[in-house]
Amino acid sequence: MTESCTVFSFSGPKGIPDYFPPDSAQFVAVRDGLLTAARRAGYGDIELPVFEDTALFARGVGESTDVVAKEMYTFADRGDRSVTLRPEGTAGVVRAVIEHGLDRGALPVKLCYAGPFFRYERPQAGRCRQLQQVGVEAIGVDDPALDAEVITIADAGFRSLGLDGFQLEITSLGDGTCRPQYRKLLQEFLLQLDLDEDTRRRAELNPLRVLDDKRPQVQAMTAAAPVLLDHLSDGAKQHFDTVLAHLDALRVPYVINPRMVRGLDYYTKTTFEFVHPGLGAQSGIGGGGRYDGLMRQLGGQDLSGIGFGLGVDRTLLALHAEGKTVGETTRCDVFGVSLGEAAKLKVAMLAGQLRAAGVRVDLIYGDRGIRGAMRAAGRSGARIALIVDDCAIKADGVGVRDLATGEQISVAVDSVVAEVISRIAPS
């Protein structure tokens, strides 16, 4: 009797990429470069759950937004509680600030974070269902200088990676004084248009969301809609003008985009987006803005805040569009080749010493001859190969070969670490 064997074949979830060498090195370099810019400005790291109470996002992000209405991964846990994989970072940070009383200490609370976020979107280049972001949040101070600092951090993060073809677009979405009047004006304009039923419902519920509609036919109909920048209160206008003055002084270039509407309901006053022409129609690589009512809306003090989220995946695509790469392209600096059992132990000991000194070392495994071992060394991308055989151990010698030139010398075992470090140290 022959037993049948089931063969399994698994693929990753649709719209979610795997990152592995060498591409993963570039991904890590982009993420860390963007985070470093925030840390240098005094922002501390915060780690948050990847899922939260669904009501947090419904209330914080806005029930009429596409994010909440169409894009969230929501499910019931085993306690029959509705939870959602986080679609963005700000609501979770604000929840943590309120829950742990961080807003009761020194202000502003300055936090940064990185990690995966989840949106059920149509998969396409740079639009993944698991998107990787770096974000910052500054909570507790309503100061246009802080807005400028947050924007400057993002600008500096991109430039630190060598990215220079991006553009900062900025506007103001007003405050509680002018928004209600503008909302009424916009609603009157929209309801006279020949809108489909769903769009008309959004116009009645939250007219700003209609301006965020990406369908060409809707954009054409709303092209003549009133612009919020023309209806700012004196306070909102002064705030926006001061932000621009700071950006001018800091030499951060920008373009005012009066028709920008971000996809999240909590934005007020300063709102911005970084775009890159190399990404086509889906050109955004990051954005953010001020959210002065969100703390109160989520049950906290009436404190202001500002932040951003920058797409790691999309920044990497923008770099590639400019023909640039970042990060280490090789996995190791040194490749250890052992010929014989005693040699294998000696190479492992040397590798441990070099790794402790901060040198990246990979080793040959399995029984290979010298030719196969050296081919593996060449493919590793290492600059140096350590070659040890059982005979060399008796003579207290280790072969140190420059893999670029092929030059090889014999070095005493006790001198190998110093010799290697001297060779790979920056000149």
Curated annotation (Swiss-Prot):
<dbReference type="GO" id="GO:0006427">
    <property type="term" value="P:histidyl-tRNA aminoacylation"/>
</dbReference>
<keyword id="KW-0436">Ligase</keyword>
<dbReference type="Pfam" id="PF03129">
    <property type="entry name" value="HGTP_anticodon"/>
</dbReference>
<dbReference type="InterPro" id="IPR036621">
    <property type="entry name" value="Anticodon-bd_dom_sf"/>
</dbReference>
<keyword id="KW-0648">Protein biosynthesis</keyword>
<comment type="similarity">
    <text>Belongs to the class-II aminoacyl-tRNA synthetase family.</text>
</comment>
<keyword id="KW-0030">Aminoacyl-tRNA synthetase</keyword>
<dbReference type="InterPro" id="IPR041715">
    <property type="entry name" value="HisRS-like_core"/>
</dbReference>
<keyword id="KW-0067">ATP-binding</keyword>
<dbReference type="InterPro" id="IPR033656">
    <property type="entry name" value="HisRS_anticodon"/>
</dbReference>
<dbReference type="InterPro" id="IPR004154">
    <property type="entry name" value="Anticodon-bd"/>
</dbReference>
<dbReference type="GO" id="GO:0005737">
    <property type="term" value="C:cytoplasm"/>
</dbReference>
<keyword id="KW-0547">Nucleotide-binding</keyword>
<dbReference type="GO" id="GO:0005524">
    <property type="term" value="F:ATP binding"/>
</dbReference>
<dbReference type="InterPro" id="IPR004516">
    <property type="entry name" value="HisRS/HisZ"/>
</dbReference>
<keyword id="KW-0963">Cytoplasm</keyword>
<dbReference type="GO" id="GO:0004821">
    <property type="term" value="F:histidine-tRNA ligase activity"/>
</dbReference>
<dbReference type="Pfam" id="PF13393">
    <property type="entry name" value="tRNA-synt_His"/>
</dbReference>
<dbReference type="InterPro" id="IPR015807">
    <property type="entry name" value="His-tRNA-ligase"/>
</dbReference>
<dbReference type="InterPro" id="IPR045864">
    <property type="entry name" value="aa-tRNA-synth_II/BPL/LPL"/>
</dbReference>
<dbReference type="InterPro" id="IPR006195">
    <property type="entry name" value="aa-tRNA-synth_II"/>
</dbReference>
<protein>
    <recommendedName>
        <fullName>Histidine--tRNA ligase</fullName>
        <ecNumber>6.1.1.21</ecNumber>
    </recommendedName>
</protein>
<comment type="subunit">
    <text>Homodimer.</text>
</comment>
